[in-house]
Amino acid sequence: MLMYPHIDPIALQIGPLAIHWYGLTYLAAFGLFMFLGTRRLRHEPYASLTGAQAWTRKDVEDILFLGVLGVVVGGRLGYCLFYKPGYYLSHPLEIFYIWQGGMSFHGGLLGVIASMVWFARSRHRPWLQVADFVAPCVPTGLAAGRVGNFINGELWGRFCDPSLPWGMVFPQSGSMLPRHPSQVYQFLMEGLLLFVLLWLYARRERRQGEVAAAFLVGYGCFRFIAEYFREPDAFLGILSLGMSMGQWLCVPMIVAGVLLWVWARRQPAR
């Protein structure tokens, strides 16, 4: 059994300026996206596109900018609508109180999809081509986010058997019983493992939509599994069929991914 190592959320204090670890994890996520996106330009079909359809570093920068907007706006609206709709309908101005916390991955995903559709239309490119480009670059950002969750001592797991060697006590949870370090589980599954699988899968030229579909199915399945070890939101608890809100939101994600993959496989090879 391990004790959560209290980590000061402020990485560096320079006078009145406080640099938080969580902010640094976001910075790392953006940097990793730029690095991987630049590498992705060498993969087919992007490497062989020419003229107006050619992909450049400027495209990667624009996608990152739009993606950040999609994550912030979609993530916040998703949290308000999926997790506390009644409260935020009664207190609509608090939707803008982002500093109070409350972001949803699934809402952020919808925001990113919307921003990618806009990017594709503005560049006169198939939006699935854009989605396939982005998908393998996302998991490292998710991994960085889970590091931030762990440093902040938030989103801890459910109670575990005291004999579990890596069971961890999170004093901030209000209990001294060991829990699953679910942030670490999600870092490994939704971050590192999903990245390796998607990156290897995307190295070969695929039918349009296949890589994006693999991301939807892969993330949905890994998140669904991780939710069994993660403490549900206190104000929601466990919902019908013994599933958490996160699991219920993963179901349509997995179904959409499977349908997209089946559709993509039926398209002629490029």
Swiss-Prot record:
Segments crossing the lipid bilayer: 17-37, 63-83, 95-115, 182-202, 209-229, 243-263
Membrane listed as a keyword: yes
Keyword Protease recorded: no
Membrane protein topology class: Multi-pass membrane protein
InterPro entries with a match to the protein in the record: Lgt
EC number: 2.5.1.145
Gene Ontology biological process terms, A to Z: lipoprotein biosynthetic process
Annotated GO MF terms: phosphatidylglycerol-prolipoprotein diacylglyceryl transferase activity
Subcellular location: Cell inner membrane
Binding site for a 1,2-diacyl-sn-glycero-3-phospho-(1'-sn-glycerol): 146
GO CC list: plasma membrane
Keywords attached to this entry: Cell inner membrane, Cell membrane, Membrane, Transferase, Transmembrane, Transmembrane helix
A Pfam family it matches: LGT
Pathway entry: Protein modification; lipoprotein biosynthesis (diacylglyceryl transfer)
Entries under PANTHER family matching the protein: PHOSPHATIDYLGLYCEROL--PROLIPOPROTEIN DIACYLGLYCERYL TRANSFERASE (PTHR30589:SF0), PROLIPOPROTEIN DIACYLGLYCERYL TRANSFERASE (PTHR30589)
Function: Catalyzes the transfer of the diacylglyceryl group from phosphatidylglycerol to the sulfhydryl group of the N-terminal cysteine of a prolipoprotein, the first step in the formation of mature lipoproteins.
Family to which the UniProt record says this protein belongs: Belongs to the Lgt family.
Protein name stated in the entry: Phosphatidylglycerol--prolipoprotein diacylglyceryl transferase
